[in-house]
Amino acid sequence: MPKVKEIEILIIGGGPAGLSAAVAAADLGANVLLIERDDKPGGQLVKQTHKFFGSKKQYAGDRGYQIGNFLIEQCETNPKVEVWTETTVLGIYEDGVVTAEGQGKHLKINPEKIIVATGASEKMIAFPNNDLPGIYGAGAVQTLMNVHGIVPGQRVLMIGAGNIGLIVSYQLLQAGVEVVGIIEASPTIGGYLVHASKIRRAGVPILTSHTITEAYGQDSVEGALICQLDEKWQPIPGTEQDLKVDVICLAVGLSPLTELCFQADCQMKFVPELSGHVPLRNKYLETTRLGLYVAGDVSGVEEASSAMVEGRLAGICAAYSLGYGNDVALKLQTEALAELSELRAGPAGQKTVKGIMKLMDKGGATC
């Protein structure tokens, strides 16, 4: 039987939320173990080359990969933080034991508190031949280009005009790839105007109320058929277009990766505003399973800026519940809550606020 690893706070997921949680908890004095399934922490940050918005505290003006490197360095230089990479958590059990697999070994951890920061996965959509080589999720395209330096093709159709679709389209243009167009099923663009304006200035059409009806090609993508949608989201006959492309990139949203929350018997609820099933929690991010916190996209899909603040809040609350930071934790917690309110104050954030209000649970957090 494997030896059990005793730790005060276990953080599952080394993306923006997980790294921020680790730093915050360790800064208050808690001993932290962070588990990341990839060979390097950072999550989505390592492939983001665009500059962040917000305040200086949310790293405004810095690029995603720079923020990721900074958070990784903070974890690596803090003696209170231990990081296991290339390790996958398998389960959270009734007795509090967490099992994981890493480098061919079966591992057991017995944490006092758990923060789940597993992020989200890309959604896909159904259309004929959507399994052809050359059809990618937007995150995969970012990884190919910004991590490995490989362009996915020469002519791209982007599906989805949210922030991810707009940002990845611009990054494709910067890499010398032609973006023949961006289509969006909704009648309005979901992403920020600043991103859409850059795309339009580059001459890329953004077609709202449009969808893909079929991809085609012999051994890989050679083209796509698209059409316009009416107010009932039905195809309008005679509006079909045939676009010659070798890549179709899907940026149609994310789904919270909540499998561990389900398995840990957290009370869950489907909330469309938060992009799927998410755990009930209180404002301090503690779920209905006492001692288990959530942060980042696993608690509802938002921007990375919000994920980092949520991670910081979860780390503070988990550490405080163990008796750390009695002199400063409440002040830090109040500051983090205020930052989240500020980030969610705009029109885009109101959707998130509406979703969160459906979830609020009294919980048992000591913050």
Indicate where each model-derived feature is located:
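Residues forming the flavin
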Residues: M1-C367
